[in-house]
C-alpha cells in the first residue's frame, strides 16, 4: 500500500526555510512601517500648525501674525492654548518635562546631543495627536518668526532629530517650513 504525505524531515526542512525567510523580511517590513508612520505623523503636525496660523490670522482679520497679536511669549502661549487641542500643558518654561522626554535623551542622527531646548521663555504642550510642541518667539521677520520644537510622538523613542524630532519655523505670514539654520 503506497504512503501519501511528507516525511517528518521534509516538513521540518520546509518550516526551517519559512522561519529563515520570515526572520529576514519581518524586520525590514517593520522598519518600513515605522518610517511611514513617522512621515504620517509629521504631515499631521505640519498641517495642524499651518491651519492654526491661517485660522488665527483670519479670526483677527490680520495680514500677518504680528498684526494678529503675537508679540511676546505670553501671547504665543495663549494662542497655542486657544487654537490647538491641548491635552497636557507644561507651563514651566525652565523645563520641558513631562511634555517632552528628558532633554539629555534627544540626539542627532550622528549620536551627538540635540540641544533643542535652549529657549527658556515658553511652555511646552502635548497635542491630542500625541505630539509634543514647544513654541519659541524669535521675533525675526524672516523665515524664523516663530520656532516650534516638535516631537511627533511625544515622549516615545527614538527621540532623534530628523526622525521623530524636528524644528519647524513659521514666518511672520504664518507659513510653516523647516528651519535648517534659519533660526540662528
Protein language model annotation of sequence segments:
Residues 72-184:
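Intrinsically disordered, low-complexity regions enriched in Pro/Ser/Thr/Gly and acidic residues
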Residues 2, 9-11, 16, 43-47, ...:
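Aromatic-enriched hydrophobic runs in primary sequence
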Residues 1-2, 9-11, 61, 65, ...:
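Extended alpha-helical regions
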Residues 2-34, 41:
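N-terminal single-pass transmembrane signal-anchor helix
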Residues 31-65, 70-77:
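Membrane-proximal N-terminal amphipathic helix
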Amino acid at each position: 500500500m503506497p504512503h501519501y504525505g511528507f516525511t517528518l524531515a521534509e516538513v521540518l526542512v520546509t518550516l526551517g526555510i519559512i522561519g529563515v525567510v520570515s526572520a529576514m523580511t519581518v524586520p525590514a517590513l517593520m522598519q518600513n512601517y515605522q518610517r511611514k508612520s513617522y512621515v504620517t505623523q509629521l504631515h499631521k503636525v505640519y498641517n495642524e500648525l499651518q491651519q492654526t496660523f491661517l485660522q488665527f490670522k483670519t479670526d483677527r482679520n490680520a495680514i500677518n501674525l504680528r498684526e494678529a497679536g503675537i508679540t511676546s511669549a505670553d501671547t504665543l502661549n495663549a494662542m497655542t492654548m486657544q487654537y490647538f487641542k491641548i491635552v497636557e500643558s507644561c507651563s514651566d518654561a525652565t523645563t520641558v518635562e513631562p511634555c517632552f522626554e528628558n532633554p539629555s535623551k534627544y540626539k542627532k542622527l550622528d549620536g551627538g546631543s540635540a540641544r533643542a531646548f535652549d529657549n527658556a521663555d515658553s511652555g511646552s504642550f502635548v497635542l491630542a495627536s500625541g505630539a509634543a510642541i514647544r513654541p519659541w518667539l524669535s521675533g525675526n521677520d524672516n523665515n524664523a518668526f516663530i520656532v516650534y520644537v516638535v516631537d511627533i510622538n511625544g515622549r516615545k523613542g527614538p527621540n532623534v532629530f530628523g526622525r521623530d524630532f524636528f524644528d519647524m519655523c513659521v514666518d511672520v505670514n504664518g507659513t510653516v517650513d523647516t528651519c535648517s539654520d534659519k533660526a540662528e
